[in-house]
Regions:
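Ligand-binding pockets and gating/stacking loops
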Residues: 1-472
């Protein structure tokens, strides 16, 4: 299931053989110049860089052929963002036998419903759904800073310069804007944007995600800054009518892009509260048993709300996991608490999407900006913590054209470095764009008229090892 390549496996030439060939070559020049020319012009052994480039090209071509053959494209994306960086060794990429300094308290591992795939014991529900998702165990970018790593994972571009590139959600919104005619905003974040993972970048405010605020686990979904606690619908409608009457200044500047974007945002907000779009967030209409299965907590109900948004056709939904994963200290207690709701909510979401026939056209991906150090820091002030680790970590992908039940790549015996088949941000995002019918080489409108593309690894010096043809 893993793709491996060993650039050192070329024909080995001994010193004696090299000397023999040199003598024969010299004799050939005397005897027949044309033959000597052909010998001297023979291609040299390929460098590791050349081998890697050829392998990338092969993967890219295979992925494009497989994506073209698929009957269904990605229509919606649900991104579960684990801000802070979740430990890969304790969850998706367990390392039995590495000892207490690496395992700590989490020395139990469980099989999944797919032969050969094992998870940490913190994820029992997701272990039963492994046939629905695949794991990329060789994700890497090598950066250990929160903001920079999040930017890499969300844009596929190197940070730097005066303008930020748009995140993947903004890219989806830009390319799907003519196809989506729903009442809800096309790019929704629950509950708040965290860090640089949902930027509109230089595309402008029209592609900024709508952050819902509030709490879908509460009896009434409240949009921060628009609906205040205790204000009923009648009063809210009266407020809107009053604003419309006195907004003469705004109407006079309707052609100004910034004012038009602000008005669009305001109308979107009212659509959530007073229009049919509000019903999407009325989770009380769901069966009690199903709500319980998702988990009666914020993350579980976010997952349920995300499924309802998919049914409404929203192109891109981000769930920013409530509470962080930045476990420099108190790691083991935090992981137990966080993984309980992650395991329940995400497993139920995948099963629910599958049962409703939505998983094939809905791409789900779950990751933080990086993983965490495999070796535990027991000394003060950490007292059992794991730190930032961008050298290798794991990403879960499901649906939207990705097949389930597979593992791509591997980390080394302790989960510290990539062992086989590195996957870089551009490889992951490029694969997602491909499955959604988005041309990753397409040019984007830049406010300064500069050349800017969805992805541009060669000109930026970004690493790439090839699209994820193994999962298509």
């Amino acid at each position: 299931m893993t793709a491996s390549h060993h650039p050192g496996n070329h024909e080995q030439i001994s010193r004696r053989e090299a000397m023999r060939r040199g003598v024969c070559g010299a004799a050939g020049m005397i005897a027949a110049g044309s033959v000597a020319s052909r010998v001297l012009a023979a291609p040299a052994e390929k460098t590791p860089e050349q081998v890697a480039a050829e392998l990338k090209k092969t993967r890219d071509e295979a992925a494009k052929a497989k994506a073209k053959a698929k009957k269904v494209q990605t229509k919606s994306v649900i991104q579960v963002f684990l801000w802070g960086g979740m430990s890969h060794n304790d969850t998706w990429d367990p390392k039995p036998g590495t000892g207490y300094d690496y395992l700590g308290e989490f020395d139990k591992f469980i099989p999944t419903n797919v032969n050969g795939i094992q998870l940490g014991a913190l994820l029992p529900n997701l272990a039963k759904q492994a046939d629905k998702y695949s794991l990329i165990r060789s994700m890497t970018h090598g950066n250990n800073g929160h903001e920079t790593a999040a930017y890499l994972m969300q844009t596929g571009h190197l940070p730097g310069g005066r303008l930020a590139y748009p995140a993947v959600g903004a890219i989806f919104t830009f390319f799907k804007k003519d196809q989506y005619k729903g009442l809800l905003p096309p790019y929704v974040v629950m509950l708040e944007a965290a860090g640089r993972f949902s930027e509109e970048g230089f595309l402008g405010p029209a592609y900024k995600p709508f952050a819902t605020g509030g709490d879908p686990n509460a009896p009434r979904f409240e949009v921060q800054g628009i609906v205040n606690r205790g204000i009923d619908d009648g009063r809210q409608k009266a407020r809107r009518e009053l604003v419309d009457k006195v907004n003469l200044f705004g109407y006079g500047l309707a052609d100004v892009p910034e004012m038009a974007a602000a008005e669009t945002a305001r109308q979107n907000a009212y659509g959530l509260i007073l229009g049919k779009g509000r019903e999407v967030f009325n989770l009380e209409s769901e069966p009690t048993e199903l709500r319980d299965r998702y988990g009666r907590n914020t993350f579980g109900q976010e997952c349920l709300a995300a499924r309802r948004m998919v049914e409404a056709g929203v192109p891109y939904i981000t769930i920013s996991f409530p509470g962080g994963w930045d476990t420099h200290s108190n790691h083991f207690a935090t992981m137990r608490n966080q993984c309980a709701s992650l395991d329940q909510g995400l497993a139920t979401l995948l099963g629910d999407l599958k049962d409703r026939g939505l998983l094939e056209s809905t791409l789900v991906w779950c990751t933080g900006e990086f993983g965490r150090t495999p070796k535990v820091s027991w000394e003060p002030p950490w007292n059992g913590g794991r730190h930032h680790h961008g050298d290798v970590f794991t990403v879960l992908v499901a649906g939207g054209g990705f097949v389930g039940g597979r593992v791509v790549g591997s980390s080394d015996e302790k989960g510290e470095k990539v062992k086989e088949r590195p996957v870089y941000p551009a490889d992951l995002l490029g694969s997602m764009y491909l499955l959604a019918g988005i041309d990753a080489s397409a040019k984007l409108p830049h406010p300064w008229g500069l050349d800017a593309y969805v992805l541009d690894t060669e000109n930026e010096g970004m690493k790439a090892a090839g699209l994820l043809e193994e999962l298509m």
